[in-house]
């Protein structure tokens, strides 16, 4: 029978777990690598209580962030449509493209809320018209918004 040691990870370890996870590993792996590298500590009752307290705080923080994302989604959907002005050439083709940064700036101007540009998904916009953008506000909260590209 193989003996295992219970440890609490203090840092993220690839293929093993994240910081705060309780893991069972071989004694040699714990003694020779994880503990000397300060990647883990022995799982004592006091440390387990600390880990559980940290997990609960993180859970509460995630719930608050999700609630803020839902409120932000409602505010974005109330706006309806955003207008972005671009210079136009022949055949209603715009110079350059509309980027996620342009959309983020338009959102901030319309709602005074900051949105991370990396969470904005837009189609390739090369002409005037109305397009749909998807904004990821949280892992499971996304908002749809219309973008109207007009000539400046």
Swiss-Prot record:
SUPFAM superfamilies: L9 N-domain-like, Ribosomal protein L9 C-domain. Pfam families: Ribosomal_L9_C, Ribosomal_L9_N. GO terms for cellular component: ribonucleoprotein complex; ribosome. The keyword RNA-binding applies. One of its GO terms (molecular function) is rRNA binding. Keywords: Ribonucleoprotein, Ribosomal protein, RNA-binding, rRNA-binding. InterPro entries: Ribosomal_bL9 (IPR000244), Ribosomal_bL9/RNase_H1_N (IPR009027), Ribosomal_bL9_bac/chp (IPR020594), Ribosomal_bL9_C (IPR020069), Ribosomal_bL9_C_sf (IPR036791), Ribosomal_bL9_N (IPR020070), Ribosomal_bL9_N_sf (IPR036935). One of its GO terms (biological process) is translation. Belongs to the bacterial ribosomal protein bL9 family. HAMAP family: Ribosomal_bL9. Binds to the 23S rRNA. This is Large ribosomal subunit protein bL9. It comes from Trichormus variabilis (strain ATCC 29413 / PCC 7937).
């Amino acid at each position: 029978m193989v003996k295992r040691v219970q440890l609490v990870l203090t840092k993220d370890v690839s293929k093993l777990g994240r910081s705060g996870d309780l893991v069972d590993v071989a004694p040699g792996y714990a003694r020779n690598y994880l503990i000397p590298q300060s990647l883990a500590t022995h799982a004592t009752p006091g440390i387990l209580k600390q880990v559980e307290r940290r997990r609960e705080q993180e859970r509460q923080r995630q719930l608050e962030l999700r609630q803020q994302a839902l409120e932000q989604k409602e505010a974005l959907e109330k706006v309806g449509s955003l207008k972005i002005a671009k210079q136009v050439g022949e055949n209603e083709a715009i110079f350059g493209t509309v980027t996620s940064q342009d959309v983020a700036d338009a959102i901030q101007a319309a709602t005074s809320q900051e949105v991370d540009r990396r969470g904005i998904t837009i189609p390739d916009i090369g002409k005037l018209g109305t397009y749909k953008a998807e904004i990821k506000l949280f892992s499971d909260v996304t908002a749809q918004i219309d973008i109207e590209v007009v000539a400046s």
